[in-house]
Amino acid sequence: MEFSMNATVEQLAPVEQQATAGWVVAALYQFKEVQDPADLQQRLLDLVKTINLCGTLIVAGEGINGTVAGDREAIDTIHQFLLNEGFNAMEYKESHSSDKPFRKMKIKLKKEIVTLGVEVKPRDLVGHYLDPKEWNELIARDDVILIDTRNDYEYKAGTFKGAIDPKTETFREFPEYVKKELEQHKDKKIAMFCTGGIRCEKSTSLLLQEGFKEVYHLKGGILKYLEETPPDESLWEGECFVFDGRTAVTHGVEEGANIKCHACGWPLTPEESALPSYEHGVSCLYCIDKTTEKQKAGFRMRQSQIAAAKHKRL
């Protein structure tokens, strides 16, 4: 198979519907040199064909990143495989989902395991890691600039008290935000956070590369914070958007109350999904005026097809 590092190669493995109650969800990443990413992708594909997993793993020359779900045995199998491959310093977190959180199992080959679009070296240059207690102490200070490195729709579901929203739609836009909004604050303490920690590996590396002096980030990201921090000690407000069928999680990494608008992808609170503007898979208050009636008709057709497919499987 020919491979260009600028291309995305995606291979799928079949996933059977799990009969057991609940799914173990494992979020993981590690920046580590991978000599032959295409070979690792193929061996991962061979493995996941033999176990019941769903989710996505991204393989690149700089490491591995992804979230997968399955039964206990399947998760332990993929975890041990990666450990045997030398990924023994993974940022690794587990949670649970009552429903199947992903439709398929994907193994993707990419240039970056998280796409910033600017060359940085997080294995060599990265911000100061803080555990949840240290994080609370830092962001309570008045001389700290607290930045949410996630995208606008993620910020909408929840964030830390006092955090700045860069209003980015993709992580690729973050370097431009730094150039326009942070350049004059190189002498300030900068604290950044993201869902699982991987985006902050690159964002803190970027800032240090650009000459910022005091750059901090939350080790393990929001997910680790919600797992370890009691609600009465937490500075988190709202829910944490996740890229799977749960939409968002809250303290204890328990499934939250938000649902996702499948037309635009934005998270909705129970109050927002009760509004007349919400039609499942068709519209919500954030997108109802941004699509045509023809597009809405197409969305309704898609929902009918999905419902028919589900009925056929029963």
Curated annotation (Swiss-Prot):
The active site is formed by: 194
A Pfam family assignment: UPF0176_N
Enzyme class (EC, first level) = oxidoreductase
Name the UniProt key words of this record, in alphabetical order: Oxidoreductase, tRNA processing
Database matches in InterPro entries: Rhodanese-like_dom (IPR001763), Rhodanese-like_dom_sf (IPR036873), TrhO (IPR020936), TRHO_N (IPR040503)
The chemistry this enzyme catalyses reads: uridine(34) in tRNA + AH2 + O2 = 5-hydroxyuridine(34) in tRNA + A + H2O
- Which GO terms are recorded in the biological process aspect for this UniProt protein? tRNA modification
Q: Name one GO molecular function term.
A: oxidoreductase activity, acting on paired donors, with incorporation or reduction of molecular oxygen
Q: Which family does it belong to?
A: Belongs to the TrhO family.
Give the gene symbol: trhO
Q: Which domain of life is it from?
A: Bacteria
Question: Which organism encodes this protein?
Answer: Acinetobacter baumannii (strain SDF)
Q: What are the Rhodanese domain coordinates in residue numbering?
A: 140-234
Q: What is its EC number?
A: 1.14.-.-
Which NCBIfam families does the record associate with it?
Answer: PRK00142.1-4
Designated name of the protein: tRNA uridine(34) hydroxylase
The protein's role, per its UniProt record: Catalyzes oxygen-dependent 5-hydroxyuridine (ho5U) modification at position 34 in tRNAs.
